[in-house]
């Protein structure tokens, strides 16, 4: 499957991230059963990453690149585009499909 992007609320439809730009996002990460494992919203601090530098899982690299500034989307990411057979011990089980609610706040 890779990554599936479903729009929750649209962005500007014009400003898409490019490799080397820093994406500033708010997100909530959940397992398929809806169990939350992480949220920048809970910390009240947006998360930043540079696109194309493998700072985040592949599902984010490809999913966020399809979003425009201001867009909020549900990213459903298969294990091979997330943490795979290893998972993230104590947080994400092996072979887990992940669901993220991501809002692209701005680009830097």
UniProtKB/Swiss-Prot annotation:
Pfam families: FKBP_C. It is found in: Cytoplasm, Cytosol; Sarcoplasmic reticulum membrane. The modification N6-succinyllysine is found at residue 53. Disulfide bonds: none annotated. Keywords: Acetylation, Cytoplasm, Isomerase, Membrane, Rotamase, Sarcoplasmic reticulum. GO terms for cellular component: cytoplasm; cytoplasmic side of membrane; cytosol; membrane; ryanodine receptor complex; sarcoplasmic reticulum; sarcoplasmic reticulum membrane; terminal cisterna. The modification N6-acetyllysine is found at residue 53. Belongs to the FKBP-type PPIase family. FKBP1 subfamily. Interacts with TGFBR1; prevents TGFBR1 phosphorylation by TGFBR2 and stabilizes it in the inactive conformation. Interacts with ACVR1B and SMAD7. Identified in a complex composed of RYR1, PDE4D, PKA, FKBP1A and protein phosphatase 1 (PP1). Interacts directly with RYR2 and RYR3. Interacts with GLMN; rapamycin and FK506 abolish the interaction with GLMN in a dose dependent manner. Interacts directly with RYR1. This is Peptidyl-prolyl cis-trans isomerase FKBP1A. It comes from Homo sapiens (Human). The lineage of its organism: Eukaryota, Metazoa, Chordata, Craniata, Vertebrata.
């Amino acid at each position: 499957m890779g990554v599936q992007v479903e729009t929750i609320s649209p962005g500007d439809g014009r400003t898409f991230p490019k490799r080397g730009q820093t994406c500033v996002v708010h997100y909530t990460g959940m397992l398929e059963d809806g169990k939350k494992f992480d949220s920048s919203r809970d910390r009240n601090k947006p998360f930043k990453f540079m696109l194309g530098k493998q700072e985040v899982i592949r599902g984010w690299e490809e999913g966020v690149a399809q979003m425009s500034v201001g867009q909020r989307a549900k990213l459903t990411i298969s294990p091979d585009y997330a943490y795979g057979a290893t998972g993230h011990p104590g947080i994400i089980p092996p072979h887990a499909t992940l669901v993220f609610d991501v809002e692209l706040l701005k680009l830097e």
